[in-house]
Curated annotation (Swiss-Prot):
Protein source organism: Gallus gallus (Chicken)
Keyword annotations from UniProtKB, A to Z: Protein kinase inhibitor
Keyword RNA-binding annotated: no
Region Disordered, residue ranges: 49-76
Family: Belongs to the PKI family.
GO CC term, one of those recorded: cytoplasm
Name assigned to this protein: cAMP-dependent protein kinase inhibitor alpha
Blocked amino end (Thr): residues bearing it: T2
UniProt site positions, description: Important for inhibition: R16, R19, R20
Function: Extremely potent competitive inhibitor of cAMP-dependent protein kinase activity, this protein interacts with the catalytic subunit of the enzyme after the cAMP-induced dissociation of its regulatory chains.
Length: 76
Protein backbone atom coordinates (compact mmCIF):
# COMPACT_ATOMS: atom_id res chain seq x y z
CA UNK A 1 0.00 0.00 0.00
CA UNK A 2 1.38 3.44 -0.85
CA UNK A 3 1.36 6.51 1.35
CA UNK A 4 -1.55 7.97 -0.59
CA UNK A 5 -3.63 4.84 -0.14
CA UNK A 6 -2.96 4.72 3.61
CA UNK A 7 -3.84 8.41 3.97
CA UNK A 8 -7.04 7.83 2.02
CA UNK A 9 -7.90 4.83 4.19
CA UNK A 10 -7.28 6.88 7.36
CA UNK A 11 -9.52 9.65 6.04
CA UNK A 12 -12.34 7.24 5.23
CA UNK A 13 -12.02 5.55 8.63
CA UNK A 14 -12.22 8.90 10.44
CA UNK A 15 -15.84 9.43 9.38
CA UNK A 16 -15.14 12.93 8.09
CA UNK A 17 -16.63 13.84 4.77
CA UNK A 18 -14.62 16.90 3.81
CA UNK A 19 -13.96 20.52 4.64
CA UNK A 20 -17.41 21.06 6.09
CA UNK A 21 -16.69 18.70 8.99
CA UNK A 22 -13.09 19.87 9.32
CA UNK A 23 -14.26 23.42 9.96
CA UNK A 24 -16.76 22.17 12.51
CA UNK A 25 -13.98 20.29 14.34
CA UNK A 26 -11.87 23.44 14.54
CA UNK A 27 -14.71 25.52 15.96
CA UNK A 28 -15.67 22.89 18.53
CA UNK A 29 -12.11 22.34 19.75
CA UNK A 30 -11.32 26.05 20.28
CA UNK A 31 -10.88 27.13 23.90
CA UNK A 32 -13.67 29.05 25.58
CA UNK A 33 -13.55 32.79 25.68
CA UNK A 34 -14.61 35.78 23.69
CA UNK A 35 -13.10 38.91 22.22
CA UNK A 36 -13.88 41.06 25.26
CA UNK A 37 -11.84 38.73 27.48
CA UNK A 38 -9.00 38.88 24.98
CA UNK A 39 -9.09 42.68 24.97
CA UNK A 40 -8.97 42.71 28.77
CA UNK A 41 -5.99 40.35 28.88
CA UNK A 42 -4.14 42.34 26.23
CA UNK A 43 -4.74 45.58 28.14
CA UNK A 44 -3.12 44.02 31.22
CA UNK A 45 0.15 43.34 29.40
CA UNK A 46 3.05 45.53 30.46
CA UNK A 47 4.90 46.53 27.32
CA UNK A 48 7.04 49.24 28.87
CA UNK A 49 10.68 48.24 29.18
CA UNK A 50 12.76 49.20 32.15
CA UNK A 51 16.01 50.95 31.33
CA UNK A 52 18.63 48.44 30.16
CA UNK A 53 16.18 45.64 29.34
CA UNK A 54 16.08 46.50 25.65
CA UNK A 55 19.52 45.08 24.83
CA UNK A 56 18.93 41.82 26.71
CA UNK A 57 15.78 41.00 24.75
CA UNK A 58 17.21 41.50 21.26
CA UNK A 59 18.02 38.59 19.00
CA UNK A 60 21.60 37.34 19.30
CA UNK A 61 22.06 37.87 15.57
CA UNK A 62 21.14 41.54 15.95
CA UNK A 63 23.61 41.95 18.80
CA UNK A 64 26.46 40.31 16.89
CA UNK A 65 25.69 42.42 13.83
CA UNK A 66 25.95 45.60 15.89
CA UNK A 67 29.15 44.37 17.53
CA UNK A 68 30.67 43.65 14.12
CA UNK A 69 29.70 47.13 12.93
CA UNK A 70 31.33 48.73 15.95
CA UNK A 71 34.48 46.63 15.45
CA UNK A 72 34.68 47.75 11.83
CA UNK A 73 34.38 51.40 12.90
CA UNK A 74 37.20 50.96 15.42
CA UNK A 75 39.46 49.39 12.79
CA UNK A 76 38.95 52.33 10.41
Amino acid sequence: MTDVESTYADFIASGRTGRRNALHDILVSSPGGNSSELALKLSELDINKAEGEGDAQRNPSEQTGEAQGEAAKQES
